């Protein structure tokens, strides 16, 4: 089993547990160049809020989109957008990625901005 298949297996297991809770989830995905975050409805069919380093305003503001500072900015932005829509409690879905580096930075800044998980 390769690295990607292992990550997807971990993500599937975590998503199954989150689905049992019927909780709104904050999903994080990272690539070598960008970081993405989405708040997804409990039924999984609706994206309530989204933020990523692909957005032009974020790219211009940050310069480098693949570091912890960029992840912190995305965490703050996704929290603001979710709170705007009335979502304060979420389940954190790290998509099988290690809770370290950019994933942890995004989570901590989202917590500081007001999301509870």
From Swiss-Prot:
Keywords: Ribonucleoprotein, Ribosomal protein, RNA-binding, rRNA-binding
One Gene Ontology cellular component: cytosolic large ribosomal subunit
InterPro entries: Ribosomal_uL18_bac-type, Ribosomal_uL18_bac/euk
Transmembrane regions: none
CDD domains on file: Ribosomal_L18_L5e (cd00432)
Gene Ontology molecular function, alphabetical: 5S rRNA binding; structural constituent of ribosome
Keyword RNA-binding: yes
Cross-referenced Gene3D superfamilies: 3.30.420.100
GO process annotations (BP): translation
Family designation: Belongs to the universal ribosomal protein uL18 family.
Quaternary state and interactors: Part of the 50S ribosomal subunit; part of the 5S rRNA/L5/L18/L25 subcomplex. Contacts the 5S and 23S rRNAs.
UniProt function note: This is one of the proteins that bind and probably mediate the attachment of the 5S RNA into the large ribosomal subunit, where it forms part of the central protuberance.
Protein known as: Large ribosomal subunit protein uL18
Species the sequence originates in: Aliivibrio fischeri (strain MJ11)
Lineage, top ranks: Bacteria, Pseudomonadati, Pseudomonadota, Gammaproteobacteria, Vibrionales
